[in-house]
Amino acid sequence: MDKLLERFLHYVSLDTQSKSGVRQVPSTEGQWKLLRLLKQQLEEMGLVNITLSEKGTLMATLPANVEGDIPAIGFISHVDTSPDFSGKNVTPQIVENYRGGDIALGIGDEVLSPVMFPVLHQLLGQTLITTDGKTLLGADDKAGVAEIMTALAVLKGNNIPHGEIKVAFTPDEEVGKGAKHFDVEAFGAQWAYTVDGGGVGELEFENFNAASVNIKIVGNNVHPGTAKGVMVNALSLAARIHAEVPVDEAPETTEGYEGFYHLASMKGTVDRADMHYIIRDFDRKQFEARKRKMMEIAKKVGKGLHPDCYIELVIEDSYYNMREKVVEHPHILDIAQQAMRDCDITPEMKPIRGGTDGAQLSFMGLPCPNLFTGGYNYHGKHEFVTLEGMEKAVQVIVRIAELTAKQQ
């Protein structure tokens, strides 16, 4: 399908891992390389109003080819890959006509197994693109990037009726910064879709409310032999804090619409310890209750400490559940569902146990649910995507454009 696989393999060959804790946006030079490549390809494709901002947001417009009062719509993907696993020297494997069983990843002992990933049972006969076991693949979200670029080529090359189509490619989605610098007014779409989901048929308009919790613990270190009544062990205080967090409300014990507390990192000495939690919940009231719970725990554990020893807690909201914004515009979901059905796909409405750029954009005035890409097992060496799933995503993007043109 018009260079879809070729595009994808080219994009994943570029190391675009984002980096947390960096003030600049994009956080890595590799993202600029892909953004500049995409800008060049958009120019060659004949799109107009192409801009690449100093914060790494690439925007372009495919002009309407029919007259009428047709709303401008957008499609958005991010160019960065997760900092959770290496994205350098990605070497994809192409497994044609998958016949079941384990897939060897490279020459080591790593395998992609249907025992661990039962979804493979549903993909018999398809073409799978996997890693070699040493890196992530980057289907999150270079599959989405390739699908949008291919859909533009299909729309333009086949003279399919459509209104004005806006596209954008953003940096640093994986570290939560890309959408913060997105100029919604300049983009000019009435609504948009991120192409950043998973398996075929997924249509997502609900995501977590999210916050980060950073805890600084200052203790007092003296020689252990003379420590009685004097030492305040910051590590012990950290352990007490975590012991107060509900053990059955962690990522590994929750699913569906259940929220959680997640201790993402902890480091320290007797003198000083630092803890980093993330809090997630779909329900806004429960989300606020979780934040209060963390404050209460810190206050309880810190009670009675020497004045020079203390526990400092900082909570920062990251993003909110876009449901409350998207449901105000039900036609956006209706069009996407109809497009899927027209492509012989059963829409699967499911909550995102995470976030997307669309969550932030929805609260910035651009309602933005999430479409599937055909990818699975993101952020690790078992990541893979199906070529058939990617082709279906292209078909859905094209069909959404067609259906929107009929809405006038």
From Swiss-Prot:
* Keyword field contains Transmembrane helix: no
List, alphabetically, the PANTHER family matched: PEPTIDASE T
For this protein, the record's Pfam families field holds: M20_dimer, Peptidase_M20
The record's section on PROSITE patterns has: ARGE_DAPE_CPG2_1, ARGE_DAPE_CPG2_2
Show the SUPFAM superfamilies listed in the entry. Bacterial exopeptidase dimerisation domain (SSF55031), Zn-dependent exopeptidases (SSF53187)
Describe the task this protein carries out: Cleaves the N-terminal amino acid of tripeptides.
Active-site positions, per UniProt? D80, E173
Q: Tell me which cofactor or cofactors this protein depends on.
A: Zn(2+)
The main location class comes to cytoplasm
Check the record and name the InterPro entries matching this protein. ArgE/DapE_CS (IPR001261), Bact_exopeptidase_dim_dom (IPR036264), Peptidase_M20 (IPR002933), Peptidase_M20_dimer (IPR011650), Peptidase_M20B (IPR010161)
Q: What is the lineage of its organism?
A: Bacteria, Pseudomonadati, Pseudomonadota, Gammaproteobacteria, Enterobacterales
What is one cellular component GO term in this UniProt entry? Answer: cytosol
Q: Any idea where this protein resides?
A: Cytoplasm
What is this protein's record name?
Answer: Peptidase T
Enumerate the NCBIfam families for this protein.
peptidase-T, PRK05469.1, PRK13381.1
Cofactor note text:
Binds 2 Zn(2+) ions per subunit.
Q: Which family does it belong to?
A: Belongs to the peptidase M20B family.
Q: Which reaction does it catalyse?
A: Release of the N-terminal residue from a tripeptide
